Every structure is written in C-alpha cells, then in structure tokens.
C-alpha cells in the first residue's frame, strides 16, 4: 500500500507532499500554495479529501487527493475564526472546527461532495478551545479548553447539533492546560496531554445505570523523574494496536514512549528521545512501522522506525521542509 506524508508549513504558506517508501526513505513529490498561513490539516480517507485551516482570512480549503497522493484544490469555506483543530463525526457528515484564539467550537455539515457548508452551530466562551474529537463508540464530542483546565462533553444529535451530556465537564489539574486528545482503539479509554504542566491524563469512559460516565484513572509526567516548572507539551498519538503511546514536548525537544498496560490501559513510562527542535506535531503510519516528527523551529522533520515488540524508535533520516511546519499527516492511499 502506497503511503504519502502531508506537511503543513505555516510561514511558507504551503503543503508539502512526500512519498514514503517501506524502507522509510522519503522524497518530495508536490508543493502546493495555500493562499494564507496554514495550521490544522485532516483527511477523510474514504472520500480522498484533505481539509486545511487557513488564516488570517479564516477559511477551510478542501483538496482532493488523487491516486498518487497529489492535492488539487476543490473549494473554500468560510469559518468564523482561526482554525486550530479539525475533526469529523463517525459518518463523516459533519466537520468540527476548534478555535483557540476565538474561543469556540463550530459544527459544519458536509455536503454530498464532502464540502463544508456554513456552520449550523457555534458554541462560544470555550476559553482556549484547542481541540475537539469525537468518541465514536459513545457518540460524545470531547472539546478541550486549555485556558479553563477542562474538557467539555457533548452528544451529537442526528441533525448535527451538540447538546451537553449528563456529566458535561471534566476538570484537569489547575494550570495544566489540556491541549490534545486521543482515544484507545477500544474507545473506552482517553488520553489527554497537558501543555503547561507536562503530564498526560488517562480517563475511563463507561456506562452506569444507562448513563455515560468518565473518570480520571491516572496522571503521569512526560519526563520520568523530572518535575520542573516549565513545560510546553504539544502532541500525543497511540499505535493502532493499542500497545504504545507517544507524546512530545517543545521546551525539552523530546518525544517520550509509554507502554500501555494491557490490563487496565494505564501508562508506563519507557523512554524519552531527543528529537527535532520544537516538535509541535508528529504522526504514526497505519501499519505502526514509522513515526515522523516535525520540528517547528528547525524546519526539519525526522522519520523513525518503530519496533514492533517494544515500540522503541530508531532514527532513519532527517529531511528539510518549509518554514514552521505545524502539522503532519501520514496517509495510506487506497
């Protein structure tokens, strides 16, 4: 299966498309201008569409992905503020846009061609709304408020309207600054990375008396035995096998590996690796064989191989990219 890598370079105002070989060797195959600074990108695989959040004009550009991974611009859709995170519902009928700077989450229907329409709902006053992601098993959108140290929970109705759950808010530690979120493949466990205090929270989601509950079961530092005053954590991802979790910090320029306990799904710190300067974004391929980290300040990205048995990372190569790479995705072509 052919793989391509998309890198969003904010200051260069472009998306680079790289071919990824099984060996880990990479080569640049396309560079497409975005008519503005770019931040989040995301893909709907079954539609072969890539969505990019652009500012300062505040819009989402939709690109088609051809059989070789090349991008072609299809449409522009206006949004009410700067996009920081893009995600979708399970059926890929709605697009959720988080805005850290404008403090909102918006819901935009996708038409039959996958093009975002005008938002049908905007929820304001979510301070520092850095990310929102749907738990497909429980039909709950987790909306992260970095500045409030909390996570809001919303059900998604059939018409795309969000409504608060019975337990409508999760509180993280004070001044922790929750930033990004991932789900275990079984969807029963949630992992959130806290930007400001250098920790990861582990949450369990379950039903009790036919009501969905979420409880915190662990808080663990991204650096073992280093409890410092300043952190600047950024991204978090889990392998599709559910055995390994990775998290990075931009202040220390590291990426840490955790093993996931197969009995309770809590995290066990394993190892940290020095990586590219200011690692804002990284991604894991669908076969769990490679991990790529983009250095926002170094304007480079590094590709590692992943050990199938331990999750350990082994450097393959470092490549130069555009100015200020802020988002990276690995896409398997159908």
Swiss-Prot record:
Pathway: Carbohydrate degradation; pentose phosphate pathway; D-ribulose 5-phosphate from D-glucose 6-phosphate (oxidative stage): step 2/3. Keywords: Carbohydrate metabolism, Glucose metabolism, Hydrolase. It is an enzyme of class 3 (hydrolase). GO terms for molecular function: 6-phosphogluconolactonase activity. Disulfide bonds: none annotated. One of its GO terms (cellular component) is cytosol. Its EC number is 3.1.1.31. One of its GO terms (biological process) is pentose-phosphate shunt, oxidative branch. PANTHER family: 6-PHOSPHOGLUCONOLACTONASE, 6-PHOSPHOGLUCONOLACTONASE-RELATED. Belongs to the cycloisomerase 2 family. This is 6-phosphogluconolactonase. It comes from Buchnera aphidicola subsp. Acyrthosiphon pisum (strain APS) (Acyrthosiphon pisum symbiotic bacterium).
């Amino acid at each position: 299966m052919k793989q391509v890598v998309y890198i969003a370079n904010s200051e260069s105002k472009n998306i680079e498309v790289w071919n990824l070989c099984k060996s880990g060797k990479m080569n640049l195959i396309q560079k497409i201008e975005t008519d503005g600074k770019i931040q989040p990108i995301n893909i709907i695989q079954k539609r072969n569409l890539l969505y990019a959040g652009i500012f300062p004009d505040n819009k989402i550009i939709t690109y088609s992905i051809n059989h070789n991974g090349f991008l072609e611009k299809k449409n522009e859709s206006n949004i009410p503020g700067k996009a920081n995170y893009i995600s979708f519902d399970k059926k890929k009928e709605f697009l959720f846009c988080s805005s850290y700077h404008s403090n909102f989450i918006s819901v935009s229907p996708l038409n039959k061609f996958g093009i975002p329409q005008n938002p049908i709902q905007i929820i304001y006053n979510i301070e520092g709304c850095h990310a929102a992601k749907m738990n497909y098993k429980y039909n709950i959108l987790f909306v992260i408020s970095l500045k409030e140290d909390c996570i809001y929970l919303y059900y998604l109705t059939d018409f795309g309207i969000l409504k608060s759950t019975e337990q409508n808010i999760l509180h993280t530690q004070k001044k922790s600054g929750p930033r990004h979120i991932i789900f275990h493949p079984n969807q029963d466990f949630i992992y959130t990375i806290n930007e400001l205090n250098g920790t990861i929270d582990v949450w369990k989601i379950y039903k009790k008396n036919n009501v969905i509950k979420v409880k915190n079961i662990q808080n663990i530092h991204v650096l073992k035995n280093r409890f410092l005053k300043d952190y600047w954590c950024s991204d978090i991802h889990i392998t599709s096998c559910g055995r390994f979790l990775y998290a990075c910090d931009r202040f220390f320029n590291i990426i840490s590996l955790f093993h996931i306990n197969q009995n309770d799904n809590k995290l066990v710190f394993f190892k940290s690796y020095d990586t590219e300067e200011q690692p804002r974004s990284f991604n894991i391929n669908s076969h769990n064989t490679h991990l790529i980290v983009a250095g926002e300040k170094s304007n480079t990205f590094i590709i590692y191989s992943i050990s199938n048995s331990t999750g350990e990372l082994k450097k393959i190569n470092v490549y130069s990219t555009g100015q200020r790479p802020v988002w990276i995705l690995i896409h398997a072509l159908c």
